[in-house]
Amino acid sequence: MVGHSLSELLPNPWPLRVLSAFAVGLWCLAVFRSTSSQQREVRLWALALIPLMPAFVFSLGNAVRQGLASVIILHAAIFLMDKKRWQFAFLSVLGVLVHEVSIVFVAAVAAMRMPMSWARAFLLISPFVSFIVVWISARFDVDLASYVRYAGYDEGAFHYLKFAVYFSLANGLLFLSTRRAEADHFHLMAKAFALTVGCASLLLVYEVPFERMVLYSDVLLPVMLAMSVVNLKLGVLGRIWLVGGLLALGFAFWTSDSVQTTLTEGKAHAEDGRIQFYKIPD
């Protein structure tokens, strides 16, 4: 409804720009809500890391409904971490109404208080599930791809590299969460991240569905990575190297062909009328 109203008031592509900016603002607000006023350095690092997250471009810059839903559910997750269940339920429903597939992210967040051993087991088993299910269904002449959205878009095997990165991150964050003495949200966010990556890995055999699903986990990363960096207690030289590395990573990320193509095509779709009245084919 909001998107429809914006499309009536503003020319393309401004409705999408407004929604994207609103979602980015919500993401930044979540950084402050999930940290205390004493964690100023964590907040600074987290805000600096947001533009380096793939979801910043591929969700908030293209699949806008998914990006908006993911940050709404991030706020729902923060409420749940503080044991405010009614607020969690309300924002979760709102997020699912924005983008129905977000119910998977809601499920992962809702299960973040499960035992650590269960979260690890799910993360380890999930990559094999889709291949086993596809193999079994093929034996019975069942085409699962016809039931999975975007399953027909197969452009290669690059997503397996992405899986390796996210899988390693999930395991690393779970390990770090067991070493933290601070009473913060890190351990719950680590489990939510691992469960979201696990849910995405259930679709690992399908490139685009996996890549779209794993983007939900990105909204959890900036705060956890920032907390990890601050805990390293780096000296001046270490901070210089880290900042330099992040600047180089940011330059490589924002000048990459995939990012430029995503942003250019998304803008073209809006300007030439292919996105009408917020009917976004994402």
Ranges and model annotations:
Residues P127, K233-W254:
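Signature aromatic-anchored transmembrane alpha helix within multi-pass, membrane-resident enzymes
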Residues M1-L10:
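Short hydrophobic/aromatic helix or loop-helix immediately within or flanking a transmembrane segment
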Residues V18-S37:
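Transmembrane-helix motifs of polytopic, lipid-linked glycan transferases
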Residues V31-L52:
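Transmembrane-helix signature of polytopic, membrane-embedded enzymes
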Residues I73-W86:
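Membrane-interface transmembrane helices that cradle and orient dolichyl/undecaprenyl
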